[in-house]
Amino acid sequence: MQVLHVCSEMFPLLKTGGLADVIGALPAAQIADGVDVRVLLPGFPDIRRGIPDAHVVSRRDTFAGKISLLFGHYNGVGIYLIDAPHLYERPGSPYHDTNLYAYTDNVLRFALLGWVGCEMACGLDPFWRPDVVHAHDWHAGLAPAYLAARGRPAKSVFTVHNLAYQGMFYAKHMDDIELPWSFFNMHGLEFNGQLSFLKAGLYYADHITAVSPTYAREITEPQFAYGMEGLLRQRHLEGRLSGILNGVDEKIWNPESDLLLASRYKRDTLEEKAENKRQLQIAMGLKVNDKVPLFAVVSRLTNQKGLDLVLEALPGLLEQGGQLALLGAGDPVLQEGFLAAAAEHPGQVGVQIGYHEAFSHRIMGGADVILVPSRFEPCGLTQLYGLKYGTLPLVRRTGGLADTVSDSSLENLADGIASGFVFEDSNAWSLLRAIRRAFVLWSRPSLWRFVQRQAMAMDFSWQVAAKSYRELYYRLK
């Protein structure tokens, strides 16, 4: 079984979000599981630099100009790169310029990604041809459409990491991307009069996966589907929509071997975690005190992530004696709010605006509770890292958060399945009640330790996801 992942980023070469973490870990787990997996990426400068051994496999004239297909390896995974400097070699992010304006030729830049994904199934590399083309998010959404236009030379899977990003472009661009105009209708890639790369992936793929079972159910409902609920409900009824939970890359996220921690620890040596807390309190300007619970946030500061709720609930958290350490950036209003709280409560609130991968490890190792109060969360990796590090996740019951964290209710404690704190409603009152439950459990140290050990024993390795994907691929054959 030969599988080609088609996507726009891969950790650690290039990362703007959780998609990169998935592509950085899943292919290696699949190779270990016996699947012949390779990855296709645009030749962005950071990616090119990370694969210096890449050599030319093929050259083509395309609708987007002359390109070369390169092949190299990264950490044992075969990587194809689309070498098209006129499209990909630019400053700024992969998607927008330094002024945060989307590149005007994004329609060509990412149509080309899907086109090359399809051409791989038609023999673009004469020595390797995929049985399954596995496309990720809107950037790769046209791959299943091109495969459909070419008579489906390979099966296709389309994974939705976040349905909110839809890859919308003017209809006139159908003339530029070498897809038949017959595809531009409601039973195709048309959406609200425009061309949607996301809908192309959803409509033409042989199977759709979401990154958690709960998110797969949620996206059939209007409040989560952004207008795609009719199509997704139909795919669900056809048995062509499922949820496969993301995993944790244990080579990177493991408190037993994490060199970024002041003190490494495991389930049986949880007392070693205390030094990480002390160091984190010092680093964030918090009062050094192991008797109070330290709550943490590592997140983009947006309303989708529920960070406005944290700001609203913060006085209640502080009144009960808790501390807050926050690492993140985003909405200027939220940034100002948290910075003001840090100024008003020195020693109790520490804020660092920005994102630093290394510091996020130190927070995960040092905090007692990690807050993930998202309004929607397709999978979420932060809560999985929290579970792995014995930093109990406090989450809202949505998407992957609902699938991975069990509330420390009396019943769950009795059954030995409690692993964190879960609240239902998207409001500060509901969040505060969960925070209150965290304080109650904190006051019972032996129970807290019991829940930590339970959380750390859970298996969210990529091997589990790799097995589920393998079973899906074989069902499609």
Curated annotation (Swiss-Prot):
Which reaction(s) does its UniProt entry say it catalyses? [(1->4)-alpha-D-glucosyl](n) + ADP-alpha-D-glucose = [(1->4)-alpha-D-glucosyl](n+1) + ADP + H(+)
Q: Which GO terms describe its biological process?
A: glycogen biosynthetic process
Pfam families from the UniProt entry: Glyco_transf_5, Glycos_transf_1
What are its E.C. numbers? Answer: 2.4.1.21
Q: Provide the GO MF annotations for this entry.
A: alpha-1,4-glucan glucosyltransferase (ADP-glucose donor) activity; alpha-1,4-glucan glucosyltransferase (UDP-glucose donor) activity
What are the protein's UniProt keywords? Glycogen biosynthesis, Glycosyltransferase, Transferase
The record's InterPro entries line, in alphabetical order, gives: Glyco_trans_1, GS/SS, Starch_synth_cat_dom
Major enzyme class: transferase
List the GO terms this entry assigns under cellular component, sorted alphabetically: cytosol
Pathway in which this enzyme or protein is active: Glycan biosynthesis; glycogen biosynthesis
On whether Protein transport is a keyword of this UniProt record, the answer is no
Gene3D superfamilies attached to this UniProt entry:
Glycogen Phosphorylase B (3.40.50.2000)
Q: Which residues bind ADP-alpha-D-glucose?
A: K15
Q: Which family does it belong to?
A: Belongs to the glycosyltransferase 1 family. Bacterial/plant glycogen synthase subfamily.
The task this protein performs is described as: Synthesizes alpha-1,4-glucan chains using ADP-glucose.
Q: What is this protein called?
A: Glycogen synthase
Gene that specifies this protein: glgA
